Amino acid sequence: MATKAAFARMNGLGNQIIVADMRGRADSITSAAAIRLASDSETAFDQIMAIHDPRTPGTDYYIAIINCDGTQAQACGNGTRCVVQALAAETGRHAFTFETRAGILTATEHDDGLISVDMGTPRFDWQDIPLAQAVADTRKIELQVGPADAPVLHSPSIASMGNPHAVFWVDKDVWSYELDKFGPLLENHPIFPERANISIAHVTSSDTIDLRTWERGAGLTRACGSAACAAAVSAARTGRTGRKVTVNVPGGPLLIEWRDDDHVMMTGPAEWEFSGTFDPATGEWSRDTQGLQGSGNADRGTA
């Protein structure tokens, strides 16, 4: 019988995260276990960040990312910050190199407790996102919600931050739109063969963006780090902002910088809530005070 694994329930600006310690184990977290944890109000999460032993020389750990519907994700910026805080508290280190399905990334915890993650380089070619058909310019593609002569949302910018994103630009409060209604339809639109994260963005100044996101495989979220990065680079790419912006998500602000070397840096907080142990096969769990330690609802709910 497999031993239980330690976990920490955390959040990154309200994005609910479970950081699971799978180091030194040959097993993985099953979809059934993830779905069971997601269905429990105490352990409900947007993503599980499962820390495994490294697979590639030069990296510290491999991070498997699991959505609340049991599917695998390529990237999760808020979850990565939670992993860094948990590991920094455990090891005393403040800089880490991780491997994920999206590639290798680095992250650093600063003296003020904020954590910066190098989210890598954005991709804009339609094949890399991917889209189901050729698109000459992903700064603005033909996709809309509502009547042809009066669409509610239209002409999103498309980008990949290791996972596909569509950013719809609006000129009024992002809360004016029924993202809970449009999100699942757009996530599963045929143009996105791997589904997509769907965001509504309002540029309020040359260095500020308000953002709400329907997260692929998770639904409405109070924060999505990769979506904030996708919105920031898309805003700069379309001339709406400069390359360093504050992205205000429902959970709070993220600082995003699209550096001259093409890498996107995301800086924000992480928060530890409680720890416990769980069975990676079944999802049965219990709360305790041991294990990984760091220092719910829809996107408008409390963190």
From Swiss-Prot:
The active site is at 76 (proton donor), 224 (proton acceptor). Disulfide bonds: none annotated. The record marks 165, 215 as: Could be important to modulate the pK values of the two catalytic cysteine residues. GO terms for cellular component: cytosol. One of its GO terms (biological process) is lysine biosynthetic process via diaminopimelate. Keywords: Amino-acid biosynthesis, Cytoplasm, Isomerase, Lysine biosynthesis. GO terms for molecular function: diaminopimelate epimerase activity. Residues 279-303 are annotated as: Disordered. Pathway: Amino-acid biosynthesis; L-lysine biosynthesis via DAP pathway; DL-2,6-diaminopimelate from LL-2,6-diaminopimelate: step 1/1. Substrate binds at residues 15, 47, 67, 77-78, 163, 197, 215-216, 225-226. Its EC number is 5.1.1.7. PROSITE patterns: DAP_EPIMERASE. Pfam families: DAP_epimerase. It is found in: Cytoplasm. InterPro entries: DAP_epimerase_AS, DAP_epimerase_DapF. Belongs to the diaminopimelate epimerase family. Homodimer. Catalyzes the stereoinversion of LL-2,6-diaminopimelate (L,L-DAP) to meso-diaminopimelate (meso-DAP), a precursor of L-lysine and an essential component of the bacterial peptidoglycan. This is Diaminopimelate epimerase. It comes from Brucella canis (strain ATCC 23365 / NCTC 10854 / RM-666). The lineage of its organism: Bacteria, Pseudomonadati, Pseudomonadota, Alphaproteobacteria, Hyphomicrobiales. The gene is dapF.
